[in-house]
Amino acid sequence: KWLYDKIGQAAWACADPGVQFDTTINEWHTCPKDGRINASNPCSEYMFLDDTACNLASINLIHFINDSGHFNEEKFAHACELMTIVLEISVTMAQFPSDEIAKRSWEYRTLGLGFANLGTLLMVKGISYDSDEARSIAGGISAIMCGTAYETSAKLAKHLGPFNRYEHNKDDMLRVIRNHRRAAYNVSNEEYEKLEITPVGIDENL
């Protein structure tokens, strides 16, 4: 507890250090047949194989709140779909720091979609940042983004073909997607596949 208090205080004061849980990271790895995840970029939004990279994009959540404080899930999902397509196109246009990183990033077609302004959204809605309700909202928004991105990726793959290393990692990738779906529906721990530590599911009552 003392150590976590120190880490939490330091992260609040200057955004460092970050804590990464190696077992969990690699159990949610979509391409483990090609190697383990050893590290992330400094801000930790990108975790994947060594010598890969991706372009990042963040969707501003506050644009999906109306005057009454309601979050428009449909418009947000549509934005996630559009940005997934944009990032997919960007793979062939990006400038990478080395030929090896460019080659591997093309083989996996990695993209980085995220959101910004969660804190502002919660303030507008009058919800405490450190509350079960806030965590449920963050989980729900993440689930919509993740599910929409995977769905859009599948639609693109249907027309253009999957990324080069998909077949080699297909079973693991589909297992990870199934586990994401289970977390979104807050299933019992026994339903998860190959996880030592199961996630906290989304409580729809919050």
Segments from the language model and where they lie:
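Internal maturation/activation junctions in enzymes
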Residues: A79-A102, W106, T110, I127-L206
